Amino acid sequence: MKENEKVIMEKGIHTDFKENMTYGEYLQLDSLLSSQKRLSDHHDEMLFIVIHQASELWMKLILHELNAAIESIKQDKLQPAFKMLARVSKIQSQIIQSWDILATLTPSEYIEFRDSLGQASGFQSYQYRMIEYALGYKTPHALKIYEKDQELHARLHTALHAPSLYDVAIQALVKEGFSIHKDVLNRDITQPYEEDATVEAAWLEVYADVKKYWNLYQLAEKLIDIEDWLQQWRFRHMKTVERIIGHKMGTGGSSGVSYLKRVLDQRFFPELWNVRTKL
């Protein structure tokens, strides 16, 4: 072997791990990398599994950041929350790119293993449901999907009854002296949020005097970023599904593309979009 072809090993690099934790042990890679179990013999099922598992890992981090941001805003610590919410947006942009990879799966390939999924569907993703709850889109009827696992059902029940990111953002408006209608402040937070004129008026004032309400303005823009990315994710989801299965019914029983098109119209922070027209 020529001198320049030899493997270079720096003297300080650790090679003896008999009594020390390794990279693989820290990340529990044996468990993580043994979780991709195909139910068919089709080569492309591995792609399908990995894409969805990777997305679930990213969603775990999104929930970690969203929940921390909600607690931070509750405690009037908006600056730390901005960093967490900005990170959520970056994660969302990463997840969106995964649709490009899944789109390499053709209809002919997917149909070879689709029956192996049974009634399993991304619609049942409990982490995605918890993200929706954290953002304020509450759907109590969806809890029935998770009754098979009582511990999981209890976690979702707790998430349903917890204040959302928008709930604490509205409370931040109140703390700044804005007058918000009592029906908003005393509403049933287990139900989807409905837009309100007093909330819109408050945000309009924030946007009209950015210097005075800089922190609230920054918070509002972070929320818009998150909803914008989420809508882009939904659109890419819808188009990828249409590309692979057309207008067939989803494995979970939904109408598939038709359902995904309808959810594109769901808004999390309606007043923040409305003020853009009224400024």
From Swiss-Prot:
Taxonomy, superkingdom: Bacteria
Q: Which cofactor does it need?
A: heme
The answer to whether UniProt assigns keyword NADP to this entry is no
What reaction gets catalysed by this protein? L-tryptophan + O2 = N-formyl-L-kynurenine
**Which keywords does this Swiss-Prot/TrEMBL entry list?**
Dioxygenase, Heme, Iron, Metal-binding, Oxidoreductase, Tryptophan catabolism
GO function terms (MF aspect):
heme binding; metal ion binding; tryptophan 2,3-dioxygenase activity
On whether Iron is a keyword of this UniProt record, the answer is yes
Query: Where along this sequence does the record place binding of substrate?
Result: 48-52, 110, 114, 251
Which biological pathway?
A: Amino-acid degradation; L-tryptophan degradation via kynurenine pathway; L-kynurenine from L-tryptophan: step 1/2
- Annotated heme binding lies at 237
Note on cofactor: Binds 1 heme group per subunit.
Q: What is its EC number?
A: 1.13.11.11
Coiled coil spans: none
- One Pfam family per UniProt: Trp_dioxygenase
Q: Which GO BP annotation is one of this protein's?
A: L-tryptophan catabolic process to acetyl-CoA
Query: Its function?
Result: Heme-dependent dioxygenase that catalyzes the oxidative cleavage of the L-tryptophan (L-Trp) pyrrole ring and converts L-tryptophan to N-formyl-L-kynurenine. Catalyzes the oxidative cleavage of the indole moiety.
Its quaternary organisation is: Homotetramer.
Q: What family is reported? A: Belongs to the tryptophan 2,3-dioxygenase family.
Q: Which NCBIfam families match?
A: trp_2_3_diox
Question: This protein is called what?
Answer: Tryptophan 2,3-dioxygenase
What species is this protein from? Bacillus thuringiensis subsp. konkukian (strain 97-27)
* Gene name for this UniProt entry: kynA
